[in-house]
Amino acid sequence: MAVARAGVLGVQWLQRASRNVMPLGARTASHMTKDMFPGPYPRTPEERAAAAKKYNMRVEDYEPYPDDGMGYGDYPKLPDRSQHERDPWYSWDQPGLRLNWGEPMHWHLDMYNRNRVDTSPTPVSWHVMCMQLFGFLAFMIFMCWVGDVYPVYQPVGPKQYPYNNLYLERGGDPSKEPERVVHYEI
C-alpha cells in the first residue's frame, strides 16, 4: 500500500514539475511566432497601410477579411484561385506551392494547393458537360432496353460428347459395340 501511495505521489510531483519547466526548443520551434499571427482588424487608413506593408502588398490591392468574429484579423483576403492557375514556368522560390518568399499565402492554402481543388476554368462549359454526360447515359439505357427487347444468342449446335457419345455412361450394353458417331464430314 505504501509503495502504491509513493508511486502516486511521485507521479503527481512529476506532473507539477513538468508544468514549471519550459518546453524544449525543438518543440516550440514548430509553432508560429507572434509576428506570424494576424493583427487586429484595421480600422483607420494608417492601420490598413501598415497591414498592407506587413504582408508585402500595395495599399490598393490590400483588402482584409470582413470583421465577422472569425479571427481573420488583418490578414489579406486573396482571390479564391488554386495554385494550378499560377504560371508553372516562372522561377518560384518554392516551386511546389508556386509561392515566392514573403508573399502572403491564401488563408485556405491547404484547400487551394495543387493536390486539391483546381479552380482554373474548364475548356468546356458546365452546360455542355452535363449534356454530354446525360446524353451518354440516355444512349446506354436505350441500348440496354433494345438488348432486352431483342435478345441475340449465339447459334448453338447439338451437344457433342466423347467416348461414342457417352455410350456406356448412358446405359449402353458393354458387350455390344456402339455405332461410330462422326461429328464431321470430309
Swiss-Prot record:
- Give the range the annotation lists for the signal sequence: none
Locate the transmembrane regions by residue number. 133-153
Which cellular component terms (GO) are annotated to the entry?
A: mitochondrial inner membrane; mitochondrial matrix; mitochondrion; respiratory chain complex I
What's an example Gene Ontology biological process for this entry? Answer: proton motive force-driven mitochondrial ATP synthesis
What top-level branch of life does the organism fall under? Eukaryota
Primary localisation category: mitochondrion
Cell location: Mitochondrion inner membrane
Q: Return any one Pfam family short name.
A: NDUF_B8
Transit peptide (residue range) = 1-28
Among the GO molecular function terms of this UniProt record, one is: NADH dehydrogenase (ubiquinone) activity
Q: Does the keyword Transmembrane apply?
A: yes
Q: Which InterPro entries match?
A: NDUFB8, Ndufb8_metazoa
Q: How does it sit in the membrane?
A: Single-pass membrane protein
Oligomeric state and interaction partners are given as: Complex I is composed of 45 different subunits.
Family according to the record: Belongs to the complex I NDUFB8 subunit family.
Disease listed for this protein: Mitochondrial complex I deficiency, nuclear type 32: A form of mitochondrial complex I deficiency, the most common biochemical signature of mitochondrial disorders, a group of highly heterogeneous conditions characterized by defective oxidative phosphorylation, which collectively affects 1 in 5-10000 live births. Clinical disorders have variable severity, ranging from lethal neonatal disease to adult-onset neurodegenerative disorders.
Question: What does the function comment of this entry state?
Answer: Accessory subunit of the mitochondrial membrane respiratory chain NADH dehydrogenase (Complex I), that is believed not to be involved in catalysis. Complex I functions in the transfer of electrons from NADH to the respiratory chain. The immediate electron acceptor for the enzyme is believed to be ubiquinone.
User: What name does this protein carry?
Assistant: NADH dehydrogenase [ubiquinone] 1 beta subcomplex subunit 8, mitochondrial
